[in-house]
Amino acid sequence: MKMKKLGSSDIEVSHFCLGSMTWGTQNSAEEGHAQIDRALEAGINFIDTAEMYPVNPISAETIGRTEEIIGQWVARHKRRDEVVLASKHSGEGMQHARDGAPISSATIPGAIEGSLKRLQTDYIDLYQFHWPNRGSYMFRKNWHYDPSNQNRAETMAHMEDALGALQREVERGTIRAFGLSNESAWGLTQWAAVAERVGGPRPISVQNEYSLMCRLADTDVSETCVNEQIDMLAFSPLAAGLLTGKYQGGKIPAGSRLALNEDLGGRVTPRAFEAVAAYLDVAEKHGLDPVQMALAWCATRPFMGSVIFGATSLEQLDVALGGAELSLSDEVMADLDAAHKAHPMPY
């Protein structure tokens, strides 16, 4: 398993990261623990979670359960120093957390304490803001995104306020580093600039959706990541399961994400299935597993810190892990580029 230091930090992470958002709904605690064990055996040291997990569905009854499942594993195995744990502070509008309050110096200490308690640890390696207070163009909002109602002065004041609170947590030893999620190129540069101007932890990562099917980061965000030493953590690298091919031809496997979410968060479109067919053709042409090909491709990107993938079975996990050592030839990369040009932005 390849390792690298994340962003400008000294935190070393595997280039594949184990996602956890189904632990507590689609997966039991025991299944989540088995996934952690298998991933660590394969060389993964990086686990991503969030206070709002699990999903499918998100509910007041289950919020925080995924962190609790990870915490049970931490307490049982006493291997905390072998794992880099990342979690997230929910953003404005998440009614199940602090009645939907925006992220601020008033919410950060309590949110961190809650995560620490559930994770049964005294520190979080990477603490991320799940989405910006000012809004985001992620999750298909890019099609009608309008930032004209944003207030720059309020945004700057918020960043200064939040960074002050985060710095106090760093000094307390409760978090090691700070990351962002569902953030834009402008937002990344402003967080970095404010941190340098007023003090506070500079962001080392941004967790955004990124896959063969969703490449919004290829231009401005990628340039920002490279120049600001902010590594991308790609979520949904399999396009919520579309790139596995299991949904082609109208199939909806029992217990699958599509069976629980009929449009996969806006990803189910006729053009999406056409794009998947093109990528499946590339995999078949070169004798590759499509899951491993998609994950390995993400890992080749020059701004990538780690590729976050999830699984609902050990069989799925083992297939995904096979992509960690896969090297894609120039011919494969050229065919993937051609498929992308033929099927850009399918959702």
Segments predicted by a language model, with ranges:
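A structural motif corresponding to the C-terminal end of an alpha-helix
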Residues: 42, 77-79, 118-123, 162-176, ...
